[in-house]
């Protein structure tokens, strides 16, 4: 990274509230044109790589794993004037973890911000897939090279056009075994999806997806929070009319049957899975103020791996948190500690700033809406 004094000055100048540049990431599924990159669904397609750009990663310290790799893809960078150069959030945390993350977190998590937040913009449902569990990733490095965590994740469905198929499949019907699942994969999507229940993506609500459980996200624009991992196995072999390569379907595995050893059939067939995983925002009484209100959209009781709040400010709102967090301004205009903020802005709010009173103010004609996303608990 170099020039530690320079970056120390940046932290001091911003008082630990670090503005980040938007980070867009390629994927094999078609974008819906709702990230501001194109007005036409699929308009980001690159014929050379056969990839689209349907994801924005927020305050990310995780590198994306894609065919035709780009070094550093997925890593968030500070929003700085060109003469000041550039630095990734990951590198800054590595150098100044105690200040930015707090002493306890920096020590427990080796200067890492252990969460990954995304905005997903699918023009069509993302293919049926699952993510491995922590214990499987740790026990089988021969299959999960380069990965340190499994992936639990959760979604919050944003107030935006939902697309053509706002339904998500989650889990498997009772009695489905590996043999039946493999046969359905061979027959294609229609047969495969008959084996999985589904739910409507309701704007303003969310869902939790346990690691190891297959799912097929629908076309609603959503905020996703997850463990800091890009591990996955696909259960479909075609997307957007194109045949996917074995490397895309089961990266790290010699074949799909081997990859299916890590699917959690027991949890996937829980008859109460859909209801148990539904997330309805919970008002936070202790932070309610005249000028604003917060809700848990990913409550800390859900999992120790992450949590998140929705904040709506109509006047002035004083915020104090126990931990550093990622901040996304979703709607409206306002100020944060007196400095202008607007929809689309993204910040890393360090432990230094988060644990002291910091002030949101709505200055526009509509409420200021933001999301606060928190990492894995350190203990």
Predicted regions and their residues:
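Ligand-binding loop in jelly-roll beta-barrel domains
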Residues: 120-125, 160-163, 212-231, 340, ...
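Short beta-strand segments in beta-sandwich/barrel cores
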Residues: 316, 332-337
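Loop-centered beta-sheet repeat module
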Residues: 185-243
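Short acidic-glycine-tyrosine-enriched beta hairpin
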Residues: 196-208, 217, 335-361
């Amino acid at each position: 990274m170099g020039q530690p004094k320079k970056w120390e000055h940046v932290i001091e100048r911003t008082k630990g509230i670090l503005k980040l540049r938007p980070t867009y990431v390629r994927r094999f599924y078609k974008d819906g044109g709702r990230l501001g990159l194109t007005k036409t669904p699929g308009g980001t397609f690159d014929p050379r790589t056969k990839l689209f750009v349907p994801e924005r990663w927020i305050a990310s310290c995780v590198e994306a794993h894609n065919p035709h790799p780009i070094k550093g893809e997925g890593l968030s960078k500070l929003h700085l004037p060109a003469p000041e150069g550039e630095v990734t959030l990951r590198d800054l945390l590595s150098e100044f973890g105690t200040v930015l993350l707090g002493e306890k977190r920096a020590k427990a998590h080796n200067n890492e911000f252990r969460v990954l937040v995304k905005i997903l913009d699918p023009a069509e449902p993302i293919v049926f897939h699952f993510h491995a569990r922590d214990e499987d990733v740790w026990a089988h490095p021969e299959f999960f090279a380069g990965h340190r965590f499994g992936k639990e994740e959760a979604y919050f469905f944003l107030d935006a056009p939902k697309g053509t198929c706002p339904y998500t499949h989650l889990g498997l019907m009772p009695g489905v075994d590996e043999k039946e699942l493999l046969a359905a994969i061979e027959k294609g999507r229609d047969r495969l999806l008959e084996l999985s229940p589904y739910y409507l993506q309701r704007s303003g609500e969310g869902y939790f997806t346990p690691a190891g459980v297959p799912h097929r996200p629908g076309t609603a624009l959503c905020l996703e929070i997850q463990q800091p991992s890009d591990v996955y196995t696909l259960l479909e072999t075609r997307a957007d009319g194109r045949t996917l390569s074995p490397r895309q379907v089961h990266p790290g595995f010699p074949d799909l049957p081997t990859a299916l050893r890590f699917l959690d059939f027991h949890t996937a067939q829980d008859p109460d899975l859909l209801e148990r995983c539904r997330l309805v925002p919970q008002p936070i009484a202790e932070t309610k103020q005249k000028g604003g209100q917060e809700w848990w959209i990913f409550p800390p009781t859900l999992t120790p791996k992450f949590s998140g709040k929705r904040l709506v400010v109509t006047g002035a709102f004083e915020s104090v948190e126990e931990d550093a967090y990622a901040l996304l301004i979703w709607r409206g205009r306002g100020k944060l500690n007196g400095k202008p903020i607007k929809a689309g802005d993204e910040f890393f709010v360090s432990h230094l700033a988060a644990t002291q009173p910091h002030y949101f103010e709505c200055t526009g004609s509509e409420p200021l809406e933001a999301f606060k996303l928190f990492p894995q608990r350190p203990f």
